[in-house]
Amino acid sequence: MSGYTVKPPTGDTNEQTQFIDYFNLFYSKRGQEQISISQQLGNYGTTFFSASRQSYWNTSRSDQQISFGLNVPFGDITTSLNYSYSNNIWQNDRDHLLAFTLNVPFSHWMRTDSQSAFRNSNASYSMSNDLKGGMTNLSGVYGTLLPDNNLNYSVQVGNTHGGNTSSGTSGYSSLNYRGAYGNTNVGYSRSGDSSQIYYGMSGGIIAHADGITFGQPLGDTMVLVKAPGADNVKIENQTGIHTDWRGYAILPFATEYRENRVALNANSLADNVELDETVVTVIPTHGAIARATFNAQIGGKVLMTLKYGNKSVPFGAIVTHGENKNGSIVAENGQVYLTGLPQSGQLQVSWGKDKNSNCIVEYKLPEVSPGTLLNQQTAICR
């Protein structure tokens, strides 16, 4: 509960006040009382009640608003019944409104593991009555589409009849797409004899040392993802955002002076791409563009069994190739997992400092079909 009361310094309630009121310059606001109550009804829903009163100088009249309602779920189906009353000082009539709404998700009729394109869609219906003979009915469907749920759609039709309002039908539809290179929207509405079409595009651009990257509309603080070679890789927890053809992406919003976790979805990597790490943490300052850099290994993936003489290469040996100086560790039986390999080349193997603890592998990867994720072969280390 909250409120306030203002008294003039003289104590004279009939004193003419300053002309500051928004609807009548003579009646400026004097005091306000508010009350709001809500109650959870266990598994049966919630109920609420709210009321307010606004008083003014130079009049005994006041604004009054009262509303109460009940929200009841039936599993994943939600319903609500609300009543509202308002009486404003500048109106001679009192307004009443009784409203009912129903929302049913399409998933109510689907299996929990359904992959239907409409699993994130809903059907809705609402009815309102002004208790003076006027009634409005609205029904529609809305939801999200595409694997990343980055296409929002809404379709709604309605009709109004009776009371003091003009009768007629209305309709509305819209599409909103959030993409890696920007956002687009288009919509159409019709009410009575008038109709309207609207459309729009928005986005952001960052120019940096490596070129230009397009993205969604930019905030004050943001992150530039740099993963050269890892193209079209989804950014986790970012709707519609993935790396471009060069491996760059923009995260348009970031929390300043806090750790921001930037993660690439490893499941969206190409078959010949492997990341040294899939998560990078950045801490941007206010208004900064922080860079999250990922190192991508591009090339073949091989599970190779290494032989040295008549034995397997020792457990724990380090295998390096090309510019990959971090190396891979040999497991039992001389097996080592290698990524980013060119079609042919050399591998350096080391398990000690003397010359008998080092050897070279000459390898050539076989031609495989695009769907093959992992090559397996045995190689001799000399």
Curated annotation (Swiss-Prot):
Domain of life the protein comes from: Bacteria
Stored Gene3D superfamilies: 2.60.40.2070, Outer membrane usher protein FimD, plug domain
GO cellular component, one term: cell outer membrane
Recorded phenotype for the gene knockout or disruption: Increased biofilm formation.
A GO biological process held by the record: pilus assembly
Alphabetized GO MF terms: fimbrial usher porin activity
Any Pfam family the entry gives: Usher
Listed PANTHER family: FIMBRIAL USHER DOMAIN-CONTAINING PROTEIN YDET-RELATED (PTHR30451:SF21), OUTER MEMBRANE USHER PROTEIN (PTHR30451)
Protein name, entry field: Fimbrial usher domain-containing protein YdeT
Protein species of origin: Escherichia coli (strain K12)
Taxonomy of the source species: Bacteria, Pseudomonadati, Pseudomonadota, Gammaproteobacteria, Enterobacterales
Gene name tied to this protein: ydeT
